[in-house]
């Protein structure tokens, strides 16, 4: 049985890709987050994230993506945010479609912990940054595109959520995606 097969029966749609983020805190391994991407509902957004997980997207021949990227913003009982492999501080913006891309749709909602959603700076400003919810966050519905959910690894999400933070909700320990890809 492959890693993919372990999660296949949990999928919302049988063709949805499954990706993973292997994470460390302060250099120590804390776990892996396994995510279903909702390509059946948000194909463009899911593909953007998938390519940044696999390293398929290249700029000037160099792979760009989430490997060695940090979770730069953590708010307990709300969300963990990462994906800024451009600047590492929440100011970077890049997508496989150019600098940013439009909101695909708001069909899926922030119904509880473990929802994967695009971080943005307003309407139609999606790029590489994402967040995973730690609670129901329905006030974000119709503002942020939900495009996946955690299948396995909520304990890892909770570990990240509970890391002490400083100014701007920045974790005091570096929370790093040391490996990522597609199952």
From Swiss-Prot:
Keyword Isomerase: yes
InterPro entries: Cyclophilin-like_dom_sf (IPR029000), Cyclophilin-type_PPIase (IPR024936), Cyclophilin-type_PPIase_CS (IPR020892), Cyclophilin-type_PPIase_dom (IPR002130)
Keywords noted in UniProt: Isomerase, Rotamase
Domain called PPIase cyclophilin-type: residue spans: 20-182
Gene Ontology terms, MF aspect: cyclosporin A binding; peptidyl-prolyl cis-trans isomerase activity
Catalytic activity: [protein]-peptidylproline (omega=180) = [protein]-peptidylproline (omega=0)
Enzyme class: isomerase
GO biological process assignments: protein folding
GO cellular component term, pick one: cytoplasm
Enzyme Commission code(s) on record: 5.2.1.8
Protein origin, superkingdom: Eukaryota
Pfam families, per database record: Pro_isomerase
Function: PPIases accelerate the folding of proteins. It catalyzes the cis-trans isomerization of proline imidic peptide bonds in oligopeptides.
Family, as annotated: Belongs to the cyclophilin-type PPIase family. PPIase H subfamily.
Protein name, UniProt field: Peptidyl-prolyl cis-trans isomerase 11
Originating species: Caenorhabditis elegans
Gene label: cyn-11
